[in-house]
Amino acid sequence: MDSDSERASLESIKDNSECVHVSNEPNLTATCVDSSVGEEGVTDVNSSAAVSELVPPEQGEGALLNSVPEISERGIPVDVVSSVDGGGEENAAFNIQEIDSVGGDAAAVEEVPLKSSSVVGEGREEEAGASIVKEEDFVAEANLSGDRLEENKEVSMEEEPSSHELSVCEVNGVDSLNDEENREVGEQIVCGSMGGEEIESDLESKKEKVDVIEEETTAQAASLVNAIEIPDDKEVACVAGFTEISSQDKGLDESGNGFLDEEPVKELQIGEGAKDLTDGDAKEGVDVTEDEMDIQVLKKSKEEEKVDSTTELEIETMRLEVHDVATEMSDKTVISSAVVTQFTGETSNDKETVMDDVKEDVDKDSEAGKSLDIHVPEATEEVDTDVNYGVGIEKEGDGVGGAEEAGQTVDLEEIREENQELSKELAQVDETKISEMSEVTETMIKDEDQEKDDNMTDLAEDVENHRDSSVADIEEGREDHEDMGVTETQKETVLGKVDRTKIAEVSEETDTRIEDEDQEKDDEMTDVAEDVKTHGDSSVADIEEGRESQEEMTETQEDSVMADEEPEEVEEENKSAGGKRKRGRNTKTVKGTGKKKEEDVCFMCFDGGDLVLCDRRGCTKAYHPSCVDRDEAFFQTKGKWNCGWHLCSKCEKTATYLCYTCMFSLCKGCAKDAVFFCIRGNKGLCETCMETVKLIERKQQEKEPAQLDFNDKTSWEYLFKDYWIDLKTQLSLSPEELDQAKRPLKGHETNASKQGTASETDYVTDGGSDSDSSPKKRKTRSRSKSGSAEKILSSGDKNLSDETMEWASKELLDLVVHMRRGDRSFLPMLEVQTLLLAYIKRYNLRDPRRKSQVICDSRLQNLFGKSHVGHFEMLNLLDSHFLKKEQNQADDIQGDIVDTEEPNHVDVDENLDHPVKSGKDKKRKTRKKNVRKGRQSNLDDFAAVDMHNINLIYLRRSLVEDLLEDSTAFEEKVASAFVRLRISGNQKQDLYRLVQVVGTSKAPEPYKVGKKTTDYVLEILNLDKTEVISIDIISNQDFTEDECKRLKQSIKCGLINRLTVGDIQEKAIALQEVRVKNLLEAEILRFSHLRDRASDMGRRKEYPYLLKLSNSLTMLTLRECVEKLQLLKSPEERQRRLEEIPEIHADPKMDPDCESEDEDEKEEKEKEKQLRPRSSSFNRRGRDPISPRKGGFSSNESWTGTSNYSNTSANRELSRSYSGRGSTGRGDYLGSSDDKVSDSMWTSAREREVQPSLGSEKPRSVSIPETPARSSRAIAPPELSPRIASEISMAPPAVVSQPVPKSNDSEKIWHYKDPSGKVQGPFSMAQLRKWNNTGYFPAKLEIWKANESPLDSVLLTDALAGLFQKQTQAVDNSYMKAQVAAFSGQSSQSEPNLGFAARIAPTTIEIPRNSQDTWSQGGSLPSPTPNQITTPTAKRRNFESRWSPTKPSPQSANQSMNYSVAQSGQSQTSRIDIPVVVNSAGALQPQTYPIPTPDPINVSVNHSATLHSPTPAGGKQSWGSMQTDHGGSNTPSSQNNSTSYGTPSPSVLPSQSQPGFPPSDSWKVAVPSQPNAQAQAQWGMNMVNNNQNSAQPQAPANQNSSWGQGTVNPNMGWVGPAQTGVNVNWGGSSVPSTVQGITHSGWVAPVQGQTQAYPNPGWGPTGHPQSQSQSQVQAQAGTTGSGWMQPGQGIQSGNSNQNWGTQNQTAIPSGGSGGNQAGYWGNQQQSQNGDSGYGWNRQSGGQQNNFKGQRVCKFFRENGHCRKGASCNYLHN
């Protein structure tokens, strides 16, 4: 390209002199050179970095300058001579002096004339003029965009990653259209060659552009954030990073008239580099990068120096021209300076202002100087190195240039000399500036902010990375940035870094706090759960309060995190939270809203510092985190935090009374027993604070200066006094108010002056809320004290001062002796406290940082057990060291906790693991009084069977495992001890029994027991038999009181030998070692857990815990936990317990000859209950320890060891379903002492109840034998129903031959023999009944009177039923003389074992008793077709499914509820006429019919006794005795509301072979004579086949005979005649049907003959059709098939629920509807009728002659249910 074309090119762009066309080629680094110029270079004398670079402009490369100021060389003056190859267009040399901007000097440009030198390029010489540009020239042309800086930097690094030498285009990322054109031709054009005549116009245009740039800078910067191309010069300037470009370096064109605008671009590049300060990765390795780049540039400079030399003439010419240009540009300097001021906030000419600002910034960031201290010496070394490099470059510049070098040697040498001079000057200036800077920097190091260090580091990196500008540009750009941009850039960078640092710190703190708070919340919730379990007696309100507190804490924590996320707001609050009384650092309120006026001192130590506020609304209290055992991270997490001032210091409930000056607070309940003085409302002073305040008010410290010095500013007392004075001023409290302070709820004796002297009140009693006690954790030792106790203590202690008896603990006495020089006499509490404070002051034990804390020396550490103790805590802990005080307390709770000196608490420690007793232990009080230190003398007395005694010889599995370690003594130690064995069953709760170990044996193979392996097995006495069990199945838990009581009953019954005091004591001593070890470990574990939990939750030492100690929940503080732990771990305590001889409780009542007063009292009460007309005592809870709900023993299991607990719940349900009016609806066990069998009982209330229902006095009829209670959960016995209107009347006296001998139940005349063969007794019948009902006797237990021999014994079941003769002679003896309400289902309270037989009148015949147990001795009851059970209760269904279909044998207790005649062996041949006539209305008419007698062997009803049946008009006839509840209740005790049919025996039933019934006669119920008849009568009285005539062979001894041949379905009523040959049984007959018409109905055994499975067939009368038809028992129209079916008509269909007594004309709801499928027996009401199936007894509807007047229960009528259930005497329909 020739000169014309070049000129034309320059002319074309002179209008926009600032336009710079930059090539973006990666390898092009020259500034605006001709594309054809490739050999011309630049001579560069080193800048502040002492760098002299001569960049060879090889094919696209131009001058590349390296001017990298280090951190320490900010503003170092640099003289630079630059010879720029502009394609022959310009040569420039500059000598610029730069002043450090950090030092505050305004950058100044020193104009140095340079020699004009010619630049050789492509064979032609071109002269260029260099102009010296002022620092401010180009400031206004650029506005740095923060976003663009990062982008520019990234572009720079991309385009020149290896050498970090970037062209202008690469640095700025310019991609304009001109740049693209230049890139295509491979040239870089510098625009701006203008003629000399255009300079003025250009200057004017520059000024205008400066103004425009000022306005458009912001918009341009924003628009260029995301743009890669820079379309015009203004955008280039913005990208370059200069705040203003005030001058240009105009190079001369060929004619010398034009100037090339090159400098703005270069300055822009510098500005960009300087502004790019926010990049974090530019902060490291700055020094290394500079060194590497300097080396690279120096190498290039050496080569360029040889090729590119200029003549001195050219340089001289340029110097003159530059001088002129500089003069012309001076006006622009002013404008640029103004612009600079806009961006930097300082004028470039005001150095002092810059220095002040810098120092002020440095003051704000004191850490910045630290890094400067590091970088300054390094930068100084690098500057020196750069100078040396520059010198070396000049020396080594020869040899480069090839053929063109020869013509320029002279010029290069001159330039080298100048460069050397400049280098020397620069070095000198550098040294001077460095020394000055070092001094300034040393001052700044202490206070300078981190922002400046980061900004200067970024500046150095940017200059280092972007040194592709000319030396002149670098000099001017550096000056501009030092004055204009450095400070601002540093501020921005450092602020950014500080913000990031703060954000990181806040985030880290927040995360830590959130984690801590989450853990804290988890711990607290876990503690709440544990507390709820441990402290079972806590009220629901307490739990709710805890839950609410937790929610409040959560909300507070959330607010806290929100506050932390706004550090500026918190900072503002911190500024406003200060107060005049801060003594520590400025208070920083971590929490709080600032809406309330917070206190500025800690409420616990009264000192200032970093405090946290309580978040409770209206609470102004502040605390040190350490005072509440929290760290600041805890308060930075989510949730609210309420201080412990708002919780009662004793029970942790919401506090009502608050102390003004300490954390002590009380709820209303605790305030009754505590000393608190209310001053205003519910706020006042605790006892401790009141005494301290009184000392302050009365100035008693002047009288006793050694005690409390409230004027010592270093003491805690001074802080307390200061706080009190301020508080009193704020509240305007007067001395009169203090004197009139009242105790809450006790207006008397609250005046402080009435409390007596200071010695009368304990300084720390309740008020020990102290500095270290946390919110909820105050010591509560004083809870059992009163004011009078305090006075007694104070006065009493004075009297004891001369005694030798120790009045305090050893540790406290040591301190007192030390301070009083050997005097051990008694001191009151306050004097001891004063002595302690004097000791602390004498030895200066106050913590200098926290005056409320005391540093414990060895003496205090022994006293308090810790290295630091709070003031209040210390005073409070003294309370535990006063022994006298504890002994004077009424309720010695502390003695239970620390029992070092009191041996009477031994068993308390031993029983710590035992469950809390449900009732009061009367013997426990005497146990404390009668402390025995040696062996007891009453070793032969009978020992009490109570929790304490049995605990001494009770072995848990863990104890047995410990005993296995000594195999030699294992058997000896475990023998005679008790273990707890689980009893299998279907109960929801497992049942356990205490059994005695009688020996050990070896197992065939070893097995695992815990962590041990053994082959030992235990031989235990399980009731009446010995069993072998493995150790691993015994319980590892403590036994319960109920289990202990059951054990006591077993011992009383003789199953286990009675224990004596000597036996238990000997065994307890043998087990003492292992028990003490186990108990100590358990106690240590428990107390350790309490201590750790309290520590984890930050609770203080005075926080009270509830702990189970023996039979009570005891408050235990954390402090006491620690003390207890120390005590338990001490060898002395262990040895003391080992040597202690346990105390054994004696119980004279365990003597068989001693009658229990309690039992007598109960019997008397029970007798009274029997006389009550309601006869509902059976509904009351029994008093026996064995309740059906707790599970007991069936009579069978008590002696056989087999458990039938699966029947208990079912029986309980059955008892409710089947029990009559007198039976319990709660499932109470039979035969609590409420049950009496005496005839007088039966007649007393029962007969009176019956009489109103009887139309006339008629002889009573047959009764049914009652059954002894199968278990304690058996169905309640039937009693006479008040609705007995239709009850069978008595038989004529002529028939009754043998009355029942009366017996007094309370008379002790009965003996029995236990399984060991030992005769026990005498006992009363009431005792025997109770034990039998609780299941301790076998079914065949025989008893005899004291005046008789064992040969005359009778079965207990018979005796309980009233049959005291072993054999009866007649039917009259076999059955009751009076008819029983059994058929009506009335259960008698006095007769627990009555089955269907209700109560007998005194003139009735005897009830034969069967020695067998109840229906199900083995837990299986007879099942009447269990597959068809439709009972509404699942329990009953389940229970019925257990009935055994096994064949009953005469010898086997007749478990099917059949009357077993095999036992009697006697033939009763009397005749019983049952006057049961069913009229057309279904009413019974008293008539008499002969009953043929079958085989006498079967002892059935063979006698033709005539029994009149009183059937009052309107009374519904109900076959009550036929009731067999589906649940198989053993005492059906069903209470049919309608009249019973008496006790019909099967022989009464009309059979085909028995034509003797009149047409109108219905079923005559014959009563079999069965001396051994089972107590539980079954449906048809389980008679033998009495309906057999001579033509019908009789079934042999069929106990299961039933009502004729009626087809049987358990859900049926009386049904029509069964088909012949059908064994109509309940569940089938056990005897094959040998004769047609004979129904061998039985409860259990399967029927060999096919039983008709009619829908709900009941007892169908079988007999001749004509006799059956005569039975007018048709149910009413509308009650299809209900009641007695007409014989001969077959099974009546249509009613699937035949009921027992729908014989009335009144329709009966339950059986009346043909669609009744409910299967209720005996007119049981369906649920829709209001009766949810209380049993068969419920006759629905009908005109029943109730003695209550047939009234309907008003509760049942109004509410649909009656709470009395079956015991109610009114109708429930």
Curated annotation (Swiss-Prot):
Compositionally skewed regions (Acidic residues) per UniProt: 514-529, 551-572, 1153-1163
SMART domains: GYF (SM00444), PHD (SM00249), Plus3 (SM00719), SWIB (SM00151)
Biased composition (Polar residues): 752-762, 1193-1212, 1409-1433, 1441-1469, 1499-1509, 1518-1528, 1569-1579, 1678-1708, 1737-1746
Summary of the knockout phenotype: Silencing-deficiency characterized by a lower siRNA accumulation and a transcriptional up-regulation of specific loci that correlates with a local loss of cytosine methylation on DNA and an increased methylation of histone H3 'Lys-4' (e.g. H3K4me2, H3K4me3) and 'Lys-36' (e.g. H3K36me3).
Stretches the record annotates as Disordered: 145-166, 270-290, 361-409, 434-591, 741-797, 903-935, 1139-1274, 1409-1469, 1485-1605, 1649-1746
Keyword Cell inner membrane belongs to the record: no
Comp. bias regions, Basic and acidic residues: 147-156, 273-286, 361-378, 444-455, 497-513, 741-751, 903-919, 1139-1152
Tissue: Expressed in seedlings, mostly in the vasculature and shoot apices of young seedlings.
Motif (Nuclear localization signal 2): 921-928
Motif annotated as Nuclear localization signal 1, chain positions: 581-588
GO molecular function, one term: histone binding
InterPro entries recorded: GYF, GYF-like_dom_sf, Plus-3_dom, Plus3-like_sf, SWIB_domain, SWIB_MDM2_dom_sf, SWIB_MDM2_domain, Zinc_finger_PHD-type_CS
SUPFAM superfamilies, per database record: FYVE/PHD zinc finger (SSF57903), GYF domain (SSF55277), Plus3-like (SSF159042), SWIB/MDM2 domain (SSF47592)
Domain of life: Eukaryota
Phosphoserine, modified sites: S1281
Free-text domain note: The PHD-type zinc finger (599-665) binds to unmethylated histone H3 'Lys-4' (H3K4me0).
Assembly and oligomerization: Interacts with unmethylated histone H3 and AGO2. The interaction with AGO2 in required to direct DNA methylation and silencing.
The name this protein goes by in its record: Zinc finger CCCH domain-containing protein 19
Native source species: Arabidopsis thaliana
The gene coding this protein: NERD
